[in-house]
């Protein structure tokens, strides 16, 4: 894409927000409490701070302040304020391609705020438990939060992901012409690695004229043992395995499509 010569600072705001979901089946009330305690510890404020700090290095941000809090009975929040150092726009890659994976992170840019909130949830009947994390990476200027997408999804090992990317505001070039987006994008999927795309069913709902891009992701492979807590499939009879599989599948479909579906 042709590089714009800007008048002053790039005033565009780019926001990447997504929900990730982890689904689990627990057979007893004690198992349910155990899963909630386990997932709450796995994604406590300290670990989330580590993940978000690494995210800062991916988008090239300088950390100004970190606010973090664990909650009772469960949940955690982390917010990081970040700033951008002066950079040469010619050094910024705005092309559509996946960002780095966790083992290949290199700091190369800088910028705004990054936050995450977690929501463990369960119901006393049915045995289903869900863990949801809401994440937002918002930057101003030339830096793209999309570069953090690959890393965050890999780190959080999600069953279901809903992603929203939007560009707000405008910037002017040296001739005074407004530009409401400064990079090419057809789909958020173009910023994901091929191995990630192979793992998920994906669906796009994009509003191009408004610079709004929405992608939903649902894990393709279903292996019951990955969704059971404190019990293995071998300990269940065939009827129980089918009932639990149907229950989990229905739950995941409802979350993926964002609506209540009839039980078949």
Swiss-Prot record:
Where do the catalytic residues lie? Answer: 112, 117, 140
The processes (GO biological process) annotated in the record are:
spermidine biosynthetic process
Keyword Lyase attached? yes
| Cofactor binding remark | Binds 1 pyruvoyl group covalently per subunit.
Q: Which cofactor does it need?
A: pyruvate
Report the top EC class in one word.
Answer: lyase
Site described as Cleavage (non-hydrolytic), located at 111-112
- Tell me the GO molecular function terms: adenosylmethionine decarboxylase activity
Keywords of the record, alphabetical order, are: Autocatalytic cleavage, Decarboxylase, Lyase, Polyamine biosynthesis, Pyruvate, S-adenosyl-L-methionine, Schiff base, Spermidine biosynthesis, Zymogen
Q: Which reaction does it catalyse?
A: S-adenosyl-L-methionine + H(+) = S-adenosyl 3-(methylsulfanyl)propylamine + CO2
Instruction: Write down which residues bear the modification named Pyruvic acid (Ser).
Output: 112
Q: How is it modified after translation?
A: Is synthesized initially as an inactive proenzyme. Formation of the active enzyme involves a self-maturation process in which the active site pyruvoyl group is generated from an internal serine residue via an autocatalytic post-translational modification. Two non-identical subunits are generated from the proenzyme in this reaction, and the pyruvate is formed at the N-terminus of the alpha chain, which is derived from the carboxyl end of the proenzyme.
Q: Name one GO cellular component term.
A: cytosol
Listed EC numbers: 4.1.1.50
Q: Which residues form a coiled coil?
A: none
Q: Which Pfam families match?
A: AdoMet_dc
Its pathway, per UniProt, is: Amine and polyamine biosynthesis; S-adenosylmethioninamine biosynthesis; S-adenosylmethioninamine from S-adenosyl-L-methionine: step 1/1
Tell me the first and last residues of the signal peptide.
Answer: none
Q: Family assignment?
A: Belongs to the prokaryotic AdoMetDC family. Type 2 subfamily.
**What does the UniProt record say this protein does?**
Catalyzes the decarboxylation of S-adenosylmethionine to S-adenosylmethioninamine (dcAdoMet), the propylamine donor required for the synthesis of the polyamines spermine and spermidine from the diamine putrescine.
Subunit and interaction comment:
Heterooctamer of four alpha and four beta chains arranged as a tetramer of alpha/beta heterodimers.
Name of the protein this chain belongs to: S-adenosylmethionine decarboxylase proenzyme
Q: Which organism is it from?
A: Pectobacterium carotovorum subsp. carotovorum (strain PC1)
Which gene underlies this protein?
A: speD
């Amino acid at each position: 894409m042709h590089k714009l010569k800007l008048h002053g600072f790039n005033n565009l705001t780019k926001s990447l927000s997504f929900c990730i979901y982890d689904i689990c089946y627990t057979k007893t009330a004690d198992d349910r409490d155990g899963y909630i305690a386990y997932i709450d510890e796995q994604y406590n404020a300290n670990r989330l701070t580590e993940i978000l700090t690494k995210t800062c290095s991916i988008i090239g941000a300088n950390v100004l302040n970190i606010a973090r809090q664990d909650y009772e009975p469960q949940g955690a929040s982390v917010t990081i304020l970040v700033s951008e150092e002066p950079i040469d726009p010619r050094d910024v890659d705005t092309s559509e391609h996946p960002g780095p994976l966790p083992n290949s992170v290199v700091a190369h840019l800088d910028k705004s705020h990054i936050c995450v909130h977690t929501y463990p949830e369960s119901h006393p009947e049915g045995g289903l438990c869900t863990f949801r994390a809401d994440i937002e990476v918002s930057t101003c200027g030339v830096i793209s939060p999309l570069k953090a997408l690959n890393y965050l999804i890999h780190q959080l090992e999600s069953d279901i992901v809903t992603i929203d990317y939007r560009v707000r505001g405008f910037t002017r070039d040296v001739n005074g012409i407004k530009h409401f987006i400064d990079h090419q994008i057809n789909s958020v999927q173009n910023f994901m690695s091929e191995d990630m795309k192979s793992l998920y069913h994906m669906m796009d709902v994009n509003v191009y004229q408004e610079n709004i891009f929405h992608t939903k992701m649902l894990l393709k492979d279903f292996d019951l043992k990955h969704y059971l807590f404190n019990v293995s499939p071998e300990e269940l009879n065939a009827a129980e395995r089918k009932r639990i599989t149907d229950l989990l599948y229905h739950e995941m479909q409802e979350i993926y499509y964002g609506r209540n579906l009839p039980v078949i």
